[in-house]
Amino acid sequence: MGSNQLLRPRKVPKLFVFGDSYADTGNTKRDTEAWAIPYGITFPGKPSGRYCDGLIATDFLEKVLGAESPYLYRTHGRDKGLKRGMNFAFGGSKMLDSSPNSPFPNITAQVNFLVDLVLAGRVYGDITPSDVSLISYAGGDYIYYIDQNRPAAGLKALVEKVVDNLRVNMIVLGGLLFKKIAVTSLQPIGCLPSYTSASSFKSCNESQSALVELHNKLLKKVVAKLNEQSRVMKKEQHFFIIDIHNAFMTVMKNKGSKRFKNPMKSCCEGYCGRSSDGGKLYTLCDDPKSFFFWDAVHPTQEGWRSIYSVLGNPLTDFLTKP
C-alpha cells in the first residue's frame, strides 16, 4: 500500500432514510405534535420534529454507522449535492395510501423523491458503496386498518400488499447503486401503549400478533430472495433486516441494557403535545429515562438507546464492513 493511500482520509458513509415517525427527525409541518412541548424535552431541550423526548432510531443508527446527521428533505430537498445523505421520512406516512397533496408522502413517494434527484443529476455521484439506505416501517397501514374496525379477514391481503411494496422499493434502491439496503422488521404492535392500555398496561394485545408475525415472516422471505438474486448476479448488494421486533421484545422482557419499571406504559399519557383552552390534554412523567415508551406509539430516547444496544454486532457488521 502506497503512502498516498495511507494518508487518504476515510470516506465517511452517508445515510439515506425513508419511512415514518420512527425515523423522522423533523420533516413534518410545524402544526404536528412533534413540534409541540413536551416533545424534545430531553434533546435538544425543545421540540425538534422528532416523535420522542429526545434522540430516535435514526440518530442512533447514524452513530453506529459513523455518519453525519442526514439532511432533512424538508429543508435541503432542493440542494445540488447530498454530502451528508438525506432523511426523507415523514411522521404519519404509510406504505400504501397517499393523496398527491398529502402532507405525509407514503414511503414509495419518498423513494421516488430520491429517484427524481438522481434523474436531475443532483445525487448520482454522491452515492458510494459505503452508504446505507434504510426503509423504516412501523405499520401505519395496519394500525389505521385496525383503528377503523375493518374486517380482520382483510388483514392477510393487506400485509401481502405492504410487504410486496417494501420489496419493490428495496429493488428501486438497489437500482440506484446502493450496496447496503436495510429495512426494519415490524415491532410488536399489540405491545404499544395505545393497545396495552386496555389491560392497564399489564399485557400485550395478542390480537395483533398474527399480522405482525405474518409481516415479518414474509419480509424475511423477500430479503432472503433479494440477497440470493444479488449473489447469483454478482451485484455485491446486501439486503438486511434491522430486527427491531426482537429488540423491542428483549427490552420489554427486561433483558436489555436498561430496565424499565413498566415497559408497556408511556411517559406522556393522553393526547401528548396537545392542549385545549390553555389546558394540557396529557400528563407527563417525572423522568423519561425510566420509561421505555414516550407516548402511545413511540419509544423514549432511553428506549431507543436500549433497542440499539440489543441490536448489537450484527447491525454494526452490516453497517461498517466493506
Swiss-Prot record:
Q: Which InterPro entries match?
A: GDSL, SGNH_hydro_sf, SGNH_plant_lipase-like
Which Pfam families does the UniProt record give?
Lipase_GDSL
Q: What class of enzyme is it?
A: hydrolase
Spell out the CDD domains in the cross-references: SGNH_plant_lipase_like
Q: Name the catalytic site residues.
A: 21, 295, 298
Which GO MF terms does the UniProt record name? hydrolase activity, acting on ester bonds
E.C. number: 3.1.1.-
Q: Which UniProt keywords apply?
A: Hydrolase, Lipid degradation, Lipid metabolism
Superkingdom assignment = Eukaryota
An example GO biological process term is: lipid catabolic process
Q: Which Gene3D superfamilies match?
A: SGNH hydrolase
Write out the similarity annotation.
Belongs to the 'GDSL' lipolytic enzyme family.
Q: What is this protein called?
A: GDSL esterase/lipase At5g03600
